[in-house]
């Protein structure tokens, strides 16, 4: 169990410091050495030596076989000054801890001890606990189990989910403090039991906030709890985690009834069950996990029925209906249990650059995992072109540099065995990497450089490649042109109900006779291609999809202009038709993005630099062409349109709806500059 790693036995040293400062022994006899002091609210008599030093036996962290702060063996008489140990982990001499003290058994110098006590008083003063607002008062009331005060503060508008300056909430305070009545009131007021603590460890939090670690430690123990290990990380712990640490059955039951997720993990990857002791709390958590998983499964199934995966993907990806349908069907089989559990899903995405292959993989990972950072693993296979670079994939063998670090793939698969793994541009990888993939795709497991086996049968592997992209693009354009001509012929025959469709389908004959031989010649092994579940084809964009891409880019820059410069950007409908001409099949959507930057954003930047755009103005992008009808048929431009290419201009719309075009001075082009020697 991990409970011993986060709890301590007795009162920690900071309360001893506070007791020392407040003790009357410092006010009589010049701080005599043999006077007892009262420490905090626990009433533990300690001497001055105990106040300045921490012994492993008196305030030990419950790590099996280790001392409190030294990490030594149990029973060692190692003594470490707490002040220095809390700040840097180094054990100074007694003279460093108590200025003016000549030896451990000697009488301390009054002046030196007074300076040390004054410094500690300043530390405590920095973290005075007087609540300055309702949220801070709510934290205090929750810790003190003052139910009446909690209700009063909530009725006056205190935020029930407000966080302490170090990251925890009032519900977490009540849970760790065994205050069941306060937990009930907070849950009834709408407290979220699934919020995670932002507090990590004392030293990390102190470093992040730029304060002394002792200040953070005093605040953590006074405002939250004094029995938690200050070296452990609590980031992401929920109120249920803390209730389990407190081993409070009634509060655990209240939180579960209030909607707490028993499967939620903290930053260390631990669920509340991992911290439970043997007993009623553990039984309750196991039962709750089973029920919660069943409810979650039904809820996700209902959500998938109402909002299918294909619709979610289409919100982020323009076009590629066939690719989305293929991936969606495979994911649906996996989610509903209609798949081979002994083998992972493997996809190969084929198509030209900038056409949505990587984006589809990202959106699939976002759909499958809440945590997209851990749930999506991307490896650029161009980094594995040499034979010796295979070691980076699974880790170096024993005796070589990097053996302890592990491989890029195996290390991440250990953290998330069911991740979506993207092998980008797999055609550039060395053949030895493909040999490793054979085992990965066939058996769903991988052995790293240390000899450990990672089971990843539940993962989804996606490979992208530009192999045969020219053949796919030419074939798709030919099919689209044939479909367009067929639709026009049927319209010419007075079939008024005919609609022009941009949807085309790659034939099986083309896949088997054209694409597969190219793949076989490149990868040089049939067994590798035979382990791929689906080969997904990405086709060039049609005209309507290009219009969507242009509008998407213009909307992006309109939003940027409004946020950064308070400028409203509008455009005519013909602008999209003009920008579509910049599309290049080889570069996909990137060519549209670059065309918008060249023809629109360049003008905006030049006008802004020349101080032609007043703040809060409204701009409109127009097409400067006397014959706009030339833009109506972008597939078959006339010779006249080629001689007179349309240009884009910016104009300002005044408050009275009058417009005037901006006179933007063309910047100097580098290729037109003549250098003289």
Swiss-Prot record:
Residues 1-57 form a transit peptide. GO terms for molecular function: ATP binding; ATP hydrolysis activity; ATP-dependent protein disaggregase activity. GO terms for cellular component: cytoplasm; mitochondrial intermembrane space; mitochondrion. GO terms for biological process: antiviral innate immune response; cellular response to heat; granulocyte differentiation; RIG-I signaling pathway. Residues 477-505 are annotated as: Regulatory. The modification N6-acetyllysine is found at residue 559. It comes from the Eukaryota. It is found in: Mitochondrion intermembrane space. Its EC number is 3.6.1.-. Disaggregase activity is inhibited by ADP. Pfam families: AAA_2 (PF07724), Ank_2 (PF12796), ClpB_D2-small (PF10431). Residues 92-126 are annotated as: Autoinhibitory. Proteolytically cleaved by protease PARL. ATP-dependent protein disaggregase activity is stimulated by PARL-mediated cleavage of the N-terminal autoinhibitory peptide. Residues 64-103 are annotated as: Disordered. It catalyses: ATP + H2O = ADP + phosphate + H(+). The record marks 126-127 as: Cleavage. ANK repeats lie at residues 133-162, 166-195, 235-265, 268-297. InterPro entries: AAA+_ATPase, Ankyrin_rpt, Ankyrin_rpt-contain_sf, ATPase_AAA_core, Clp_ATPase_C, ClpA/B, ClpA_ClpB, P-loop_NTPase. Homododecamer when substrate-bound; the homododecamer consists of 2 homohexamers stacked head-to-head via ANK repeat-mediated interactions. The active substrate-bound form is likely to exist in a dynamic equilibrium between homohexamers and homododecamers. Homotetradecamer in the unbound state which is remodeled upon substrate binding into the homododecamer. Interacts with PHB and PHB2. Interacts with MAVS; the interaction is enhanced by Sendai virus infection. The ankyrin-repeat region is necessary for ATP-dependent protein disaggregase activity. It plays an important role in stabilizing the substrate-bound homododecamer by mediating contacts between the two homohexamers. Functions as a regulatory ATPase and participates in secretion/protein trafficking process. Has ATP-dependent protein disaggregase activity and is required to maintain the solubility of key mitochondrial proteins. Involved in mitochondrial-mediated antiviral innate immunity, activates RIG-I-mediated signal transduction and production of IFNB1 and pro-inflammatory cytokine IL6. Plays a role in granulocyte differentiation. Belongs to the ClpA/ClpB family. This is Mitochondrial disaggregase. It comes from Rattus norvegicus (Rat). The lineage of its organism: Eukaryota, Metazoa, Chordata, Craniata, Vertebrata.
